[in-house]
């Protein structure tokens, strides 16, 4: 099957088959990334504009590397150094970028739904690099690629996602993607960080506490505490959070032997998980980062609609 979408706004919009196609393509891209010369001419002559209204290291750098390995020209625009600081609206920014004739816009924005708004107003492709608490599709895809790499399939896995679910766009993309691919998701977090009705998003169980959530699971996904997105009333102290919802060698034993530990980064060591767990053989955190480049290459390739050139 081909990829029918001009844009990738969220995994909620994609079918199981389309997610499978993106993961399979990412596997092919991993082969390119393992070469001595990590570059193919697939997107030669194409221009990718990265527009980031929020701070990012891994995602922005990963998209830039992905575009360059496909031979695209890349332009990076940061909100702190752009006309946004002078009061320019998203709509005006879009018009000005579009006047430069880009082929793909990769954007991160603090407002949920900003990418739908943008995609309706530009003729080029739009890829969501994270919008508010809505979705982060490339993170969801790289998480699934990392799981499939270890277990061979996502079908039948039980995955615990622990932490600040309310403010996490990663959690939503993981839920949409994992449940479509046949996994069961358990959620745990402080009641003030658990949105009502979240279980309606798919094959999801909301657990009373962390120990219940991680017992017997294949994967433990820890989420970052997003202090920049919440008021003081949601989280009494980081020490208290770590006591009840932090992953350490003791409670990790509740999961299946050899269970995989994941985190979208950046990590608050000693809060979401201990340094011992983060640096252990069970941790797949650096593998997630590595797989991020391949996944983003696959996303850029499919929205461009081109044929894969591998020589």
UniProtKB/Swiss-Prot annotation:
SUPFAM superfamilies: Aspartate/ornithine carbamoyltransferase. GO terms for biological process: 'de novo' pyrimidine nucleobase biosynthetic process; 'de novo' UMP biosynthetic process; amino acid metabolic process. Catalyzes the condensation of carbamoyl phosphate and aspartate to form carbamoyl aspartate and inorganic phosphate, the committed step in the de novo pyrimidine nucleotide biosynthesis pathway. This is Aspartate carbamoyltransferase catalytic subunit. Its EC number is 2.1.3.2. The gene is pyrB. One of its GO terms (molecular function) is amino acid binding. Pfam families: OTCace, OTCace_N.
């Amino acid at each position: 099957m081909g990829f029918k979408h001009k844009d990738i706004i969220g995994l909620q919009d994609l079918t199981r088959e389309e997610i499978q196609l993106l993961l399979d393509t990412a596997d092919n891209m991993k082969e390119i990334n393992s070469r001595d010369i990590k570059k193919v001419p697939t997107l030669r002559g194409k221009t990718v504009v990265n527009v980031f209204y929020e701070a990012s290291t891994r995602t922005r750098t990963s998209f830039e590397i992905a575009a360059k390995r496909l031979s695209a020209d890349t332009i990076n625009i940061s909100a702190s150094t752009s006309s946004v600081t002078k009061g320019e609206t998203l709509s005006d920014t879009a018009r000005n970028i579009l006047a430069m004739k880009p082929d793909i816009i990769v954007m991160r924005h603090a407002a949920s739904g900003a990418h739908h708004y943008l995609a309706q107003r530009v003729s080029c492709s739009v890829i969501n690099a994270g919008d508010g608490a809505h979705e982060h599709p490339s993170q969801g895809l790289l998480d699934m690629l990392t799981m499939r790499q270890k277990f061979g399939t996502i079908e039948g896995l039980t995955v615990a996602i622990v932490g600040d679910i309310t403010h996490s766009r990663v959690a939503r993309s993981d839920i949409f993607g994992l449940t479509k691919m046949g996994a069961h998701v358990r959620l745990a977090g402080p009641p003030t960080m658990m949105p009502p009705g979240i279980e309606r998003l798919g094959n999801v169980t909301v657990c009373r506490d962390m120990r219940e959530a991680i017992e017997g699971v294949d994967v433990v996904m820890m989420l970052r505490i997003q202090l920049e997105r919440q008021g003081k009333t949601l989280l009494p102290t980081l020490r208290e959070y770590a006591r009840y919802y932090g992953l350490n060698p003791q409670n990790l034993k509740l999961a299946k032997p050899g269970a995989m530990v994941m985190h979208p980064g950046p990590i608050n060591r000693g809060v979401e998980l201990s340094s011992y767990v983060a640096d252990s053989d069970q941790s797949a955190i650096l593998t997630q980062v590595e797989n991020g480049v391949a996944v983003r290459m696959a996303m850029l390739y499919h929205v461009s609609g081109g044929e894969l050139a591998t020589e």
